UniProtKB/Swiss-Prot annotation:
This is Potassium/proton antiporter CemA. It comes from the Eukaryota. Keywords: Antiport, Chloroplast, Hydrogen ion transport, Ion transport, Membrane, Plastid, Plastid inner membrane, Potassium, Potassium transport, Transmembrane, Transmembrane helix, Transport. Contributes to K(+)/H(+) antiport activity by supporting proton efflux to control proton extrusion and homeostasis in chloroplasts in a light-dependent manner to modulate photosynthesis. Prevents excessive induction of non-photochemical quenching (NPQ) under continuous-light conditions. Indirectly promotes efficient inorganic carbon uptake into chloroplasts. It comes from Vicia faba (Broad bean). It catalyses: K(+)(in) + H(+)(out) = K(+)(out) + H(+)(in). GO terms for biological process: potassium ion transport; proton transmembrane transport. Pfam families: CemA (PF03040).
Length: 76
């Protein structure tokens, strides 16, 4: 699941994130600003990835609580 998430919401392709955020930025009619764009490119993928992985963990925890026990035993 983590590998699939990294392929979809990866931090690796900054050019792809610049293109997506830049096009949304222009669609809302904002003036292009490289500093704001680079800040959004560095923050937005991390937040999106964290929210997505947290929601997957919460879903799997509801489906099978024994996964939490397995996870804690793997950490030890």
């Amino acid at each position: 699941i983590s590998l699939l998430t990294d392929f979809c919401i990866g931090f690796h392709s900054t050019q792809g994130w610049e293109l997506m955020i830049g096009s949304v930025y222009k669609d809302f009619g904002f003036t292009p600003n490289d500093q704001i764009l680079s800040c959004l490119v560095s923050i937005f993928p991390v937040i999106l990835d964290t929210i997505f992985k947290y929601s997957i963990f919460r879903y799997l925890n509801r489906v099978s609580p024994s996964l939490v026990v397995i996870y804690h035993s793997m950490k030890e």
